[in-house]
């Protein structure tokens, strides 16, 4: 029970002894119930882990700072309502836009997957092969313009990262003029509920397609690769959390997960598009695989056709129930079943 609990019990015992008999008994009874409830709540996380079945282990954690650009593998990350965070790097908090403010992704510019954004202290570094690195401050100057952007039809703001950054990206892609914007904490997030009503009105994202968390299992990836001539990587599908040690497509049935103190709730499957055909190592889009193979065996149930259309499903979208930090190697437990 601990020193605090013992002290409280002693005070209530003295109080009970100074009261009439029936009041003393009642006071002692209420005290025992209250302290018992406190002890039970404190012991519940440990007891719950003993009762739960482990369904896997965290094998990889990925943050994609710039939408459609190279992912950053991390050994641990904070789980926030808007996705993974590691220091100053947050998932999909930077976005490439065109002159009209529309998002630009690897669907239009496949070579975006070759650009990386890393952070060292207060300095961000944009890097790409055969191109000089560009350094920029983690805090975008407040004198920079704020743009109204559009991501999958929903408006969201972003602060311009400057002319040098715009020229660097445009030069590397050899494209029309593009700009890089940054989502800041005071800006209004997008609501995935406006995209798919399976999400809750309170769920929020910055520049992610639909959800703050995407989970995929190594077993599902291995099953897909067994059907392909040219193997693909997890980064073709841009998951945030990759799970090992589970059955093939087990993630399809995980309603709620517990990882450390973090609780995640499954919302829906991730429907796949042509972006999966971009090779993350070369920036070349094949337009066929692995999408064609996925279409042959990962279609939705006919009753869900209105939600997913004819797009194949691979990986699952989750939202946050309880925040905390997760690490590679953490056991993954199933909740609510």
From Swiss-Prot:
GO terms for molecular function: molybdenum ion binding; molybdopterin cofactor binding; nitrate reductase activity; nitrite reductase activity; oxidoreductase activity, acting on other nitrogenous compounds as donors; pyridoxal phosphate binding. One of its GO terms (biological process) is cellular detoxification of nitrogen compound. Its main location: mitochondrion. Its EC number is 1.7.-.-. Binds 1 Mo-molybdopterin (Mo-MPT) cofactor per subunit. InterPro entries: MoCF_Sase_C, MOCOS_middle, Pyrv_Knase-like_insert_dom_sf. A lipid is attached at residue 2 (N-myristoyl glycine). It is found in: Mitochondrion outer membrane; Membrane. Changing residue 268 to I: No effect on binding of the molybdenum cofactor; no significant effect on catalytic efficiency toward benzamidoxime; no significant effect on affinity for benzamidoxime. Residues 187-335 form the MOSC domain. The chain crosses the membrane at residues 21-40. It comes from the Eukaryota. It is a single-pass type II membrane protein; Lipid-anchor. Residues 2-20 are mitochondrial matrix. Changing residue 247 to H: No effect on binding of the molybdenum cofactor; no significant effect on catalytic efficiency toward benzamidoxime; no significant effect on affinity for benzamidoxime. Mo-molybdopterin binds at residues 67-68, 92, 210-211, 238, 240, 271-273, 317. Changing residue 246 to S: No effect on binding of the molybdenum cofactor; no significant effect on catalytic efficiency toward benzamidoxime; no significant effect on affinity for benzamidoxime. Its cofactor is Mo-molybdopterin. Residues 93-183 are annotated as: MOSC N-terminal region. Catalyzes the reduction of N-oxygenated molecules, acting as a counterpart of cytochrome P450 and flavin-containing monooxygenases in metabolic cycles. As a component of prodrug-converting system, reduces a multitude of N-hydroxylated prodrugs particularly amidoximes, leading to increased drug bioavailability. May be involved in mitochondrial N(omega)-hydroxy-L-arginine (NOHA) reduction, regulating endogenous nitric oxide levels and biosynthesis. This is Mitochondrial amidoxime-reducing component 1. It comes from Homo sapiens. The lineage of its organism: Eukaryota, Metazoa, Chordata, Craniata, Vertebrata. The gene is MTARC1.
């Amino acid at each position: 029970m601990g020193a605090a609990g013992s002290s409280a019990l002693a005070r209530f015992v003295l109080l009970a002894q100074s009261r009439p008999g029936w009041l003393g008994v009642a006071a002692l009874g209420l005290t025992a119930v209250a302290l018992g409830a406190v002890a039970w709540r404190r012991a519940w996380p440990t007891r719950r882990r003993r009762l739960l079945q482990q369904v896997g282990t965290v094998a990889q954690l990925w943050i994609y700072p710039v939408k459609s650009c190279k992912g950053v593998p991390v050994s641990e990350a904070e789980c926030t309502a808007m996705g993974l965070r590691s220091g100053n790097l947050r998932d999909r908090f930077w976005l490439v836009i065109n002159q009209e403010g529309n998002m630009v992704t690897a669907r239009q510019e496949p070579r975006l997957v070759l650009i990386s954004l890393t952070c060292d202290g207060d300095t961000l570094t944009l890097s790409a092969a055969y191109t000089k690195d560009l350094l920029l401050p983690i805090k975008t100057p407040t004198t920079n313009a704020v743009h109204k952007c559009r991501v999958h039809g929903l408006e969201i703001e972003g602060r311009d990262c400057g002319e040098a950054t715009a020229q660097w990206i445009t030069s590397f892609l050899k494209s029309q003029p593009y700009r890089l914007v940054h989502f800041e904490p005071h800006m209004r997030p997008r609501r995935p509920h406006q995209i798919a009503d399976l999400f809750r009105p309170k769920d929020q994202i910055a520049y992610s397609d639909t959800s703050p968390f995407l989970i995929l299992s190594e077993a599902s990836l291995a099953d897909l690769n067994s059907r392909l001539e040219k193997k693909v990587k997890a980064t073709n599908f841009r998951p945030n959390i990759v799970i090992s040690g589970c059955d093939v497509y087990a993630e399809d049935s995980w309603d709620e997960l517990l990882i450390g103190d973090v609780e995640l709730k499954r919302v829906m499957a991730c429907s796949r598009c042509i972006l999966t055909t971009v090779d993350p190592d070369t920036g070349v889009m094949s337009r066929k695989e692995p999408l064609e193979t996925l279409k042959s065996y990962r279609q939705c149930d006919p009753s869900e056709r209105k939600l997913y259309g004819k797009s194949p499903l691979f990986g699952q979208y989750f939202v946050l129930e309880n925040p905390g930090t997760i690490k590679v190697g953490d056991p993954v437990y199933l909740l609510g079943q």
